[in-house]
Swiss-Prot record:
Organismal lineage: Bacteria, Bacillati, Cyanobacteriota, Cyanophyceae, Acaryochloridales
Name the UniProt record assigns to this protein: Small ribosomal subunit protein uS3
Subunit relationships: Part of the 30S ribosomal subunit. Forms a tight complex with proteins S10 and S14.
Keyword Ribonucleoprotein in annotation: yes
Cross-referenced NCBIfam families: rpsC_bact (TIGR01009)
Protein family membership: Belongs to the universal ribosomal protein uS3 family.
GO molecular function: mRNA binding; rRNA binding; structural constituent of ribosome
């Protein structure tokens, strides 16, 4: 039975960059790695309504530089920069006293072309008791209007409150997971419903990164077609 490698880890150094960029000796490496995990968890919890797509961390000596990619930079920055100052203050209390923290906020250009934001949108819909097929269909339509090349969505668990858990998925366009130069974005989220936890996985193919390029060239965003066929779901439980 074939197993799927993580699409982002598979392409590190080719089309994807590391989310954490620093060097540490072997005795300090576990400490800093756990620190990175705590920082990301804290930011995602504190800014849950800000549409956080990604948190990149760079370290230079005792300086920690954070780059927060968000769909709503105004929520992160706050009025007069108060949001960032409050975030830095809370991070200083959480981290060792000798850490200097710098926060950069970057706005996401194409919100509906980010796998993490689309997965978050689907989980929010599922937690509001929207039928999973409708939630997935709306997410796919939003992504197609953003000009992506292809998208694949998988939902697993007690779908629509069914007694027996199952896995269903659908795909629109191309999602070439075996092509290393393919710019694949991937995200996994969990939706907590009254029937239990549902797992949501989203793969987005943005295009191929050709030699000499740093990212895929986005195609023009497409308008919604009234005659577009509905996504066909497949059951992967057996």
């Amino acid at each position: 039975m074939g197993q799927k490698i993580h699409p982002i880890g598979f392409r590190l150094g080719i089309t994807q960059d590391h989310r954490s960029r620093w060097y540490a000796d072997s005795d300090r490496y576990p400490e800093l790695l756990q620190e990175d995990h705590r920082i990301r968890t804290f930011i995602n919890q504190q800014l849950a309504n800000a549409g956080i797509a990604e948190v990149r961390i760079e370290r230079k000596a005792d300086q920690v530089e954070l780059q927060i990619r968000t769909a709503r930079p105004g929520v992160v920055v706050g009025k007069g920069g108060q949001g960032i100052e409050e975030l830095r203050k809370q991070l200083r209390q959480m981290l060792p006293a000798n850490r200097t923290i710098k926060v950069n906020v970057v706005e996401v250009n194409r919100v509906d072309a980010e796998a993490s934001l689309l997965a978050e949108y689907i989980t929010q819909q599922l937690e509001r008791r929207v039928a999973f097929r409708r939630a997935v269909r709306q997410a796919i339509q939003r992504a197609q209007r953003a000009g992506i090349e292809g998208i694949k969505v998988q939902v697993a668990g007690r779908l629509n409150g069914a007694e027996i858990a199952r896995t269903e998925w659908t795909r629109e366009g191309r999602v070439p997971l075996h092509t290393l130069r393919a710019d694949i974005d991937y995200a996994y989220r969990t939706a907590r419903t009254i029937y239990g936890i549902l797992g949501v996985k989203v793969w987005i193919f943005k295009g191929e990164v050709l030699p000499g390029q740093t990212e895929a060239v986005p195609r023009e965003a497409t308008r919604r077609s009234p005659q577009r066929r509905l996504p066909q779901f497949e059951n992967r439980s057996n």
